[in-house]
């Protein structure tokens, strides 16, 4: 079955931005450019702040300013996605809390996600 692209187009292009190593200042610059260019991309977030030592630098939605920034992006048509609960491995309860926070912050469950490289990710260990 052939793929039918929106608007009769022959292909589609997307960007899925994961939050590793990105701070709010950089995010604001990048998304201002994407917005100016009329591109609507996907920004993944960590809803939950760290509970243990992070294994990646980057912002989480525990920062009210960063959370507002992501909500503003969503309001402008950018998709917000889930990148697991936080920037380190999460227990089941923390993952559930992260999903609940995502719903609270963005008004729905995530439609897309990309695994972070933690123990709960599907590609963790030697198979990664």
Give each language-model segment a name.
Residues 1-128:
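Catalytic alpha-helical scaffold of carbohydrate-active enzymes acting on polysaccharides/glycoconjugates
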């Amino acid at each position: 079955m052939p793929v039918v692209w929106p608007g009769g187009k022959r292909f589609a292009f997307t960007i899925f931005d994961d939050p590793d190593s990105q701070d709010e200042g950089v995010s604001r610059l990048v998304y201002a450019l994407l917005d100016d260019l009329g591109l609507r991309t996907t920004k993944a977030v960590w809803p939950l702040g760290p509970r243990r030592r992070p294994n990646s630098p980057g912002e989480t939605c525990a920062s009210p300013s960063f959370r507002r920034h992501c909500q503003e992006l969503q309001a402008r048509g950018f998709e917000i996605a889930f990148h697991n609960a936080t920037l380190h491995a999460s227990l089941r309860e923390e993952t559930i809390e992260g999903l609940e926070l995502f719903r609270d912050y963005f008004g729905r469950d995530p439609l897309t996600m990309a695994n972070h490289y933690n123990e709960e990710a599907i590609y963790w260990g030697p198979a990664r």
